[in-house]
Amino acid sequence: MKVVEIFDSIQGEGEYMGTMCTFVRFAGCNLSCPFCDEAKKYGKAKEMTIEKIVKKCEQKIVVLTGGEPTIQPQLEELVKALQAAHHHVHLETNGTNDIDYFIEWITVSPKAPKYECKCLYNEVKLVVSEDLTLEQALAHTCGQLVWLQPCDGPWLEQSKKTILKWIEKYPDLFRAGIQLHKYYNAR
């Protein structure tokens, strides 16, 4: 499997924010989002066996992230091996690939309105940028809680104002999120 890094840190986003986890970051993605810096930011991947990955996971919760984890051919086998080792598996995905096996928690972060979500999920995380409209955000609710996170960069202040406005208008559909790990200077 193509792994960029494995590390322990607090979950900085969503329902499990503040929980200690082991993160397994995979390389590669099936999308080509213009704003993505995944390859530049995280560097080169190394091939790792499922056994080596499982051995490096020390926390109860293991978060599979990326890039896009669902493009890894052996993902289902890794999930089952982690579960057999008594880990709770969480997946962070763009949602464009089918998942037909059990994962304890799935967070979908759709990257553009043109991509259709093909998996069942527990929560949605949307980065509120100048390109995201309220109508697009509402289309992702589908009965699940949607976490709205501000966009870093020059649009940050406007992003925070937009989030507050949307939550005020739809308090049962949206929650404000942050990247808590950045606040604590954690990875």
What kind of region is each of these model predictions?
Residues M1-K44, K182-R187:
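N-terminal [4Fe-4S]-dependent radical SAM core
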Residues E5, M20-C21, S32-I103:
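Conserved Radical SAM active-site core
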Residues I71-R187:
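Conserved AdoMet/S-adenosylmethionine-binding subsite of the radical SAM
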Residues V4-I10, G14, P34, K60-V63, ...:
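Generic alpha-helix detector with strongest preference for long hydrophobic helices that associate
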